[in-house]
Amino acid sequence: MATATNPRLDTQEKAMCRAINAFRAEHGKPPLKLSVALTRSAEWMAKDMARHDNLDHADSKGRDFDERMDDFGYTAPTKGEVIAAGHSDAASTLAQWKASPLHRPILLKSRLKVMGIGRARNVSSDFEWFWTADFGGTVTKTMPI
């Protein structure tokens, strides 16, 4: 599933990377680098959720986030994922995650070192926008934010 070029983040995806790192800094956590493999995984998942109009950590192939990240080349043991739908912008989506008792601890996990971000749009969906952020505890190939 790997390609020769790095994934390209749009303006809001880049804003999300910066916002997650700012949130972590507010809580004394180190910044995360942007992982190529995790970004590919997150982008694929956001598109899969949008395509199927389904907000779920299990993808259309029946994989959980751990299996999917493995398939995209991120095989390190420490992993996490947050997903959201309904907002096009990073600030509103991060606010959803920060308010969630399940997602907030993942964003602030001390052992994390890298992240990957993806968002996708389905104009036919009531949600319209779907977001995925994948996280890992081992630095592999990274790219600039």
Give the predicted meaning of each segment.
Residues M1-H52:
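A short alpha-helix/helix-coil micro-patch that ends at or immediately precedes a cysteine
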Residues T39-S88:
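Short, surface-exposed glycine/acidic/tryptophan-bearing loops
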Residues A22, E67, P105:
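Surface-exposed charge patches
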Residues P31-L32, D56, A76, V114:
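Residue-level detector of short coil/turn "hinge" positions at structural boundaries
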Residues A76, A84-I145:
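Disulfide-stabilized extracellular recognition modules
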Residues S35-A37, K61-G62, K109-R111:
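Short, glycine-/polar-rich solvent-exposed loops and beta-turns at beta-strand/coil boundaries
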